[in-house]
């Protein structure tokens, strides 16, 4: 059976606020070189008029035309609007969180509900049409949109329903994590979500879902009770541990490979107290000492304590320059207990900056009083970036030495960050095969990223970051698909480990034609 609505309905409204973290972008090749990006379909229509033959792009990246009659039939069958390039609202609908990606879909289906999603998926499959799915539009690689294809846009689907007594929530696929946090925190409940309030719950959850509460309550997928999902055949299915359990296993960590999730049902936990959160920044000369102190403390830390260590070349220190620091989230009931746990880190000396304090969960998440903000216009001034990620299963001194040396060698013209965030706790206690998320035993999730706006420096900066990554990669195993969805097949296989063959079987069963391919793609074997 499908997830049924509760009697209590939310009054959530769309939010498009830009988070504090910098724009990140994984390298992604053009989907269709045969057609000039954005132009053919952008010029193909006048407002409100459907051309007799609409130029689009196929799944194979080749030119494809679709008859006006087919488009009219789709539009008539949708409750939400179907937008072409010159229709009112098209430009705002196609924009993503990262303005570096200036995609122009031929069609945008602004879905009003699961029935619209099913019709859009059936249309795409029938025509062999390149298809992108937008939940929150926060994809680091821009895969929430596509040039010349169909964008299935879940942004209008914002309903959130909370069962306070049963401690569960159902949220539609267009909800942002800040919206869900505010709704659940209003009654003193929470579940594991990410750390950027403008992230969509859909992509976050399907890739695993790391966040401040994961060491005590597990990943987002560990708190997922069921989903409603439209698979590639256009059917709306319910998936849980008792209904379509194979599909439910696959979507918990397998990303968007198996369909479009229209509803997520989460387990909620009591959380109505202050938590300890913030960071301390030190001179770069103390980088090795910071690494050593943090990893030593983390090795014996209770589940309530989560630590991270980061190298930064931005403007965190006076006059800019390199710095090293640690970040903390203590989710226990008493922040003073967290302060006592941090005493070994205080021995590092007086920091250049200290933001650690007792705050509400919403404040830590950046969702407290968050206001709407316009998504920036894409264009030539949009930033470029290079991002690589991986999991650390050990932290030898040689790793610290390599990180410090490689990071210091990066050009001063590319603001960069290298951060390793603690895992473990409830994440590691589940079996590696219980869900598709394989890297549960990892000690840390690592990210290296540089971002710049002078596009004339693209080649030099990417080369420098690649050289830095070349020295670090040997210490990693697999990667987090939500931060690097465009990685090569070899790394993808390492990411899913022994779960990969089973995921391929699920892909063969639920999406044998690889309709859902704009993701960390698990290709069908057929």
Stretches found by the model and what they are:
Residues 2-526:
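Soluble FAD-dependent oxygen oxidases
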């Amino acid at each position: 059976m499908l997830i049924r609505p509760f009697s209590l309905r939310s009054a959530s409204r769309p939010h498009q606020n830009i988070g504090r973290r910098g724009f990140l972008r994984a390298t992604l090749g053009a989907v269709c070189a045969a057609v000039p990006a954005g132009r053919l379909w952008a010029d193909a229509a006048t407002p409100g008029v459907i051309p007799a033959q609409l130029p689009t792009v196929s799944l194979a990246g080749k030119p494809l035309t679709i008859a006006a009659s087919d488009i009219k039939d789709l539009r008539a069958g949708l409750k939400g609007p179907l937008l072409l390039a010159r229709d009112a609202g098209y430009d705002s609908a196609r924009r993503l969180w990262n303005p570096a990606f200036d995609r122009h879909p031929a069609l945008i289906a602004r879905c009003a509900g699961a029935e619209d999603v099913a019709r859009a998926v059936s249309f795409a499959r029938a025509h062999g049409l390149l298809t992108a799915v937008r939940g929150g539009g926060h994809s680091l690689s821009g895969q929430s949109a596509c040039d010349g294809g169909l964008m299935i846009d879940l942004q209008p689907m914002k309903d959130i329903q909370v069962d306070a007594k049963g401690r569960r929530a159902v949220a539609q696929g267009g909800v942002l994590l800040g919206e869900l946090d505010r709704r659940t925190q209003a009654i003193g409940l929470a579940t594991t979500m990410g750390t950027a309030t403008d992230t969509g719950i859909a992509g976050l959850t399907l890739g695993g879902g790391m966040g401040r509460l994961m060491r005590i309550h597990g990943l987002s997928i560990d708190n997922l009770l069921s989903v409603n999902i439209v698979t590639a055949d256009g059917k709306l299915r319910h998936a849980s541990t008792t209904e379509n359990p194979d599909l439910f296993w696959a979507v918990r960590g397998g990303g968007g490979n198996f369909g479009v999730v229209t509803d997520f049902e989460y387990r909620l936990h009591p959380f109505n107290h202050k938590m300890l959160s913030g960071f301390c920044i030190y001179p770069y000369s103390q980088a090795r000492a910071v690494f050593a102190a943090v990893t030593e403390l983390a090795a014996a830390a209770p589940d309530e304590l989560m630590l991270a260590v980061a190298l930064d070349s931005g403007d965190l220190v006076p006059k800019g320059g390199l710095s090293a620091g640690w970040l903390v989230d203590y989710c226990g009931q008493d922040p003073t207990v967290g302060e006592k746990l941090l005493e070994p880190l205080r021995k590092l000396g007086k920091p250049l900056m200290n933001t650690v304090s007792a705050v509400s969960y919403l404040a830590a998440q950046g969702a407290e009083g968050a206001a709407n903000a316009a998504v920036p216009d894409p264009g030539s001034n949009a930033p470029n970036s290079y991002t690589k990620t991986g999991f650390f299963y050990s932290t030898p001194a040689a790793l610290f030495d390599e990180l410090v040396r490689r990071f210091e060698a990066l050009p001063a013209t590319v603001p960069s960050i290298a951060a390793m965030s603690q895992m473990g706790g409830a994440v590691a206690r589940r079996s590696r095969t219980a869900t598709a998320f394989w890297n549960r035993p990892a000690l840390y999730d690592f990210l290296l990223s540089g971002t710049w706006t002078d596009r004339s420096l693209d080649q030099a900066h990417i080369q420098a970051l690649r050289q830095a990554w070349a020295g670090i990669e040997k210490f990693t195993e697999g990667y987090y698909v939500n931060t690097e969805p465009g990685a090569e097949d070899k790394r993808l296989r390492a990411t899913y480990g022994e779960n990969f063959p089973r995921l391929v079987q699920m892909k063969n069963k639920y999406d044998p034609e690889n309709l859902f391919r704009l993701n960390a793609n698990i290709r069908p074997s057929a």
